[in-house]
């Protein structure tokens, strides 16, 4: 499966993943809204929005 793995508003990059899902985490800090993308569907702390999906590049 192919997932996006760029940070925040960086140009789109992708990676091939062994997992069958991709994730997109969104949170805010002193720098503003932060976004992290990658493979799998990790556990997150409260206050972090997590979206997981199951198709190629679905986490852009």
Swiss-Prot record:
InterPro entries according to UniProt: Snake_3FTx, Snake_toxin-like_sf, Snake_toxin_con_site, Toxin_cobra-type
Cleavable signal peptide: none
GO molecular function terms listed in the Swiss-Prot or TrEMBL record: acetylcholine receptor inhibitor activity; ion channel regulator activity; toxin activity
CC per GO annotation: extracellular region
Official protein name in the record: Pelamitoxin a
Gene3D superfamilies: CD59
Pfam families: Toxin_cobra-type
4Fe-4S among keywords: no
Major localization class: secreted
Tissue: Expressed by the venom gland.
Covalent S-S links between cysteines: 3-22, 17-39, 41-52, 53-58
Organism: Hydrophis platurus (Yellow-bellied sea snake)
Protein location: Secreted
Keywords: Acetylcholine receptor inhibiting toxin, Disulfide bond, Ion channel impairing toxin, Neurotoxin, Postsynaptic neurotoxin, Secreted, Toxin
Family listed: Belongs to the three-finger toxin family. Short-chain subfamily. Type I alpha-neurotoxin sub-subfamily.
Role this protein plays: Binds to muscle nicotinic acetylcholine receptor (nAChR) and inhibit acetylcholine from binding to the receptor, thereby impairing neuromuscular transmission.
Keyword Disulfide bond: yes
